[in-house]
Amino acid sequence: MNAYSYMLIKNPDVNFEGITINGYVDLPGRIVQDQKNARSHAVTWDTKVKKQLLDTLNGIVEYDTTFDNYYETMVEAINTGDGETLKEGITDLRGEIQQNQKYAQQLIEELTKLRDSIGHDVRAFGSNKELLQSILKNQGADVDADQKRLEEVLGSVNYYKQLESDGFNVMKGAILGLPIIGGIIVGVARDNLGKLEPLLAELRQTVDYKVTLNRVVGVAYSNINEIDKALDDAINALTYMSTQWHDLDSQYSGVLGHIENAAQKADQNKFKFLKPNLNAAKDSWKTLRTDAVTLKEGIKELKVETVTPQK
């Protein structure tokens, strides 16, 4: 996603000089506006939403020590029969869990807003792109064969980018040998991406101006379309994590209810039966953190930087 946004930001507006679009005088302006809209969305991702995503994931990952401290305090309170400390610890922890869920939900809303805007523009851009191709073809431009080649190269680039990402995920596997296998996958992906670069450069060269125009518009559309797909994946992952926060809060809410009932007993071990509940909640937290680490690893190449879009 970062690579696609970078290309959109850096690419200049398509130039229709010398191209006659009979019957569709407004089409060049619409396509230029499509490209500007796509670039604007890419800038929003690069300067705002990306940082918010990284901050949210970092917050989850770094919360691990705080969670462990809460857990140890609550276990000690159970062992000593200290109901007040146990209630206070769980209440404070629930407050922080609810705050983290709120952050995740805010991020989901930002991503959804961006995705919805991009989705609208993708449909408009796609329609205008198809119309342009039809017009150029009718004017004698050999766009069919060139378009097929363009789609093949872009498809290969997307495939190896995904393969590279999958390889990093395999490298994090705990099973013996998986890091080596993941390293091989990443190596293969990068090797093939390197081989595709000359082909992409060749496709950017001017052979026939009408064909080149079709290429520029096609690549811009492909980039914004891939960002749209990537946002869907990010929203799904964060929605799942938000649900995990909610489930974790519910687990501790249940523990609080048990404390009230058990507090009436005189037995010092009256809270011991809550240990399995705490352990289950801890397991849920570890799963949530692992998911955050995995998502963070998947986008670790993202760097929040100042970008200067082309005019």
Curated annotation (Swiss-Prot):
Its main location: membrane. Keywords: Cell membrane, Membrane, Transmembrane, Transmembrane helix. The chain crosses the membrane at residues 168-188. It is found in: Cell membrane. It comes from the Bacteria. Pfam families: Bacillus_HBL (PF05791). GO terms for cellular component: plasma membrane. It is a single-pass membrane protein. CDD domains: ClyA_HblB-like. This is Uncharacterized 34.8 kDa protein in hlyA 3'region. The lineage of its organism: Bacteria, Pseudomonadati, Pseudomonadota, Gammaproteobacteria, Enterobacterales.
